[in-house]
Swiss-Prot record:
InterPro entries reported for this sequence: CALM/Myosin/TropC-like (IPR050230), EF-hand-dom_pair (IPR011992), EF_Hand_1_Ca_BS (IPR018247), EF_hand_dom (IPR002048)
Organism the protein comes from: Mizuhopecten yessoensis
Name assigned to this protein: Troponin C
Lineage of producing organism: Eukaryota, Metazoa, Spiralia, Lophotrochozoa, Mollusca
Additional detail: This protein binds one calcium ion per molecule.
Binding-site list for Ca(2+): 131, 133, 135, 137, 142
Sequence ranges assigned to domain EF-hand in this UniProt record: 9-44, 45-80, 82-117, 118-152
Positions carrying N-acetylthreonine: 1
């Protein structure tokens, strides 16, 4: 799969948002300001996710990130949002009766169609883990967990 890249305009907007917070022109911003920078661009990121991402990017534990690291986080968030939209669209298409659930039979067919060539046993295990209440249906959150875990 090709790597996700933000558009030039998105990157310019992200750099501008960074500069708006980097008022002293130090070339870095506090990791504590990342939530506000995301928000200024209309993106909502939970505090715990920002902390995880900051810890990952701030290898020297300075509590600050430079603009390049910020752009990497910005692109990661855009990709996550895109993936979420694609998953929601796939779920919507598969939810033929528009009840907010997919029948397990449909899910079984999807899993058997994936390029990974899952065995029947693997498919049944995945369905059992997903449809924990045995209702024969899977809601969006269960579908999302399954698709993210199977890296489909």
């Amino acid at each position: 799969t090709e790597e996700f890249r933000a558009s030039e305009k998105q990157i310019l907007d992200a750099k501008q948002a960074f500069c708006n917070v980097d008022k002293k022109k130090e070339g870095t911003v506090s990791c504590k300001d990342l939530g506000a920078i995301f928000k200024s661009l209309g993106l909502l990121v939970k505090d715990d996710k920002i902390k995880d991402w900051s810890d990952e990017m701030d290898e020297e534990a300075t509590g600050r990130l430079n603009c390049d690291a910020w752009i990497q986080l910005f692109e990661r968030k855009l990709k996550e949002d895109l993936d979420e939209r694609e998953l929601k669209e796939a779920f919507r298409v598969l939810d033929k009766e528009k009840k907010g659930v997919i029948k397990v039979d449909v899910l079984r067919w999807i899993l058997s169609s994936l390029g990974d060539e899952l065995t029947e046993e693997e498919i049944e295990n995945m369905i059992a883990e997903t449809d924990t209440d045995g209702s024969g249906t899977v809601d969006y959150e269960e579908f999302k967990c399954l698709m993210m875990s199977s890296d489909a």
